[in-house]
Amino acid sequence: MELKDKLPNLYKNIDETLESAKLILSEAVPNTQTLFHTPVVSTIHENKIVSRVMVLREFNFDNKILRFHTDNRAAKIDNITKNSSSTVIGYDPDLKIQIKMQGHTEVHIDDEVAKMAWNESTPRSKKCYSVKGGSTKEIGDPQAVSYTHLTLPTTPYV
């Protein structure tokens, strides 16, 4: 059964809306085909909004946790450390649903949360975090990329 078939045709109350959002975000974690797998995460840098698409790695409705991974060398770490306010938004035109969440972001480095995230990461993801110079560095020649061994990624929570 497709996700669209599991959702109501008409939302009559907030409980139905929340249940649908829970279902959509729960399915977005493992399903790379849904647009909610890669929502836009916005933070603040020097009084300006900075937005980027990030991969949703965990959704826990009861604890109000969304987990995303990022390289601890990325500029967003400094942004989040200085101002934890954040917004996450996703939209799927086929479902005709937008989900917007606001909250505060926590950065986890070298702690149990980060270790768990690293251990659950795929070899491909780990390779992305081991590019010398950081994952946001422009690469002129992909064949000339060298890697270093990193033990843990940063794991921001929204």
Q: What label would you give each PLM region?
A:
Residues 149-158:
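Single conserved hydrophobic/aromatic residue that forms the stacking wall/gate
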